[in-house]
Amino acid sequence: MKRILNIGLAGLVLLGGIAAVSAQPSGRGGQRCPSFQQQPPVLLRSSDWWNDRSGFPPTYTAGAKTLPLISVKGNKFVDPDGKTILFRGLCISDPDKIAIQGHWGKDHFVKVKEMGAMLVRIPVHPISWRERGTAEYLKLLDQAVQWCTELGMYVMLDWHSIGNLGLERLQDPMYQTTKWETYNFWDTMARHYAGHNTVAFYELFNEPAIDKPGSGQRFGIYPWEDWKKICEEEIAIIRAKNPQAIPMVAGFDWAYDLTPVRNSPINAEGIGYTVHPYANKRPQNQWLTKWEDDFGYVADKYPVMATEFGGFAAPPGAQPLGGGGRGGGGNAAYGPAIIKYLEGKGISWTVWCFDPNWGPTLISDWNYTLNSSGLFAKAAMAGEIK
């Protein structure tokens, strides 16, 4: 009864207001304004939102079945005949950066192919994804996929952020993202490249990083079990649209530490793990022991790929041309040690970075002059590092 009474009072107030408005003179000879005859303005809309499907870009199918499908069998990546494939490849820089600097084109990928790459890792930064926009960024990726298909190279898409996605505390502005944006990115990729054999790998998050107890509050603490849940949610999103894709999962410590996998692996089939084994992660006299303890053991049961590392001295007999930067540049022992270890364990790899600005670099300039690290990487891709 009280609710009915309130409605009644509101109705009286409304009617009173209407009466007051209708009683106002129009300013033209005292005539009253026909308020009840006025029609609401027609809103001009660019489209009918209920028919808008622009959020779901069409599937990219050009050359989708040109390259053989890659899948997971046990701890290996295999082709349709069951043959084990050990990938050797490299990372380019963000397509948005390359395009802005005027170097985007098939010729860039021809240079990658000339390095001997079987696999191209393509990093997509959250900031470039947002600023270029979905439709325009997909145009770049479609071109990359087309060129890689024509050149016989597979593609790994990498959501290139660094930090604690769970708490959304990231390292730098270029890496700022949210769980929602990350999930939406992978939903978009899975829809757009569903069934495309060239786009074989989805690296879910470039470098997860958390604070260690007592180390400050840069990223915050985050349990492995919670990170594992996020990864499993991403995998479910991808698999709902593209069951053949191979999701790749990274551990903490900037994608170096896979020790939690021993007791709590990701609860999903047909996936792989990634590692970034830069030389400075462990003391040189502990490399082999720590590599085995920290990530190598995982390769005994699951596929593993070292998706980022570099900073090599030139191979024997090659003229050093400088470069290197972060993570062991100039350390003559590092390159042979890590390549021999990875390939001895059957771990595929992509080296960083085919760009003259982002270290450790492989090229010294946009004339594609190979520096010491680039010369070593090219020799390694040719199987010359024994």
Each model region followed by its residue ranges:
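Bacterial N-terminal signal peptides
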Residues: 8-17
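Sec/Tat signal peptide C-region and signal peptidase I cleavage site
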Residues: 18-22
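N-terminal carbohydrate-binding accessory modules
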Residues: 25-119, 252, 379
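Extracellular glycoside hydrolase catalytic/binding regions
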Residues: 67-69, 101, 174, 183-201, ...
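Feature marks short, surface-exposed loop/turn motifs that line or immediately flank catalytic pockets
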Residues: 94-96, 126-130, 163-165, 208, ...
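Aromatic-lined substrate-binding rim segments of carbohydrate-active enzymes
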Residues: 104-166, 181, 227-242, 331-346
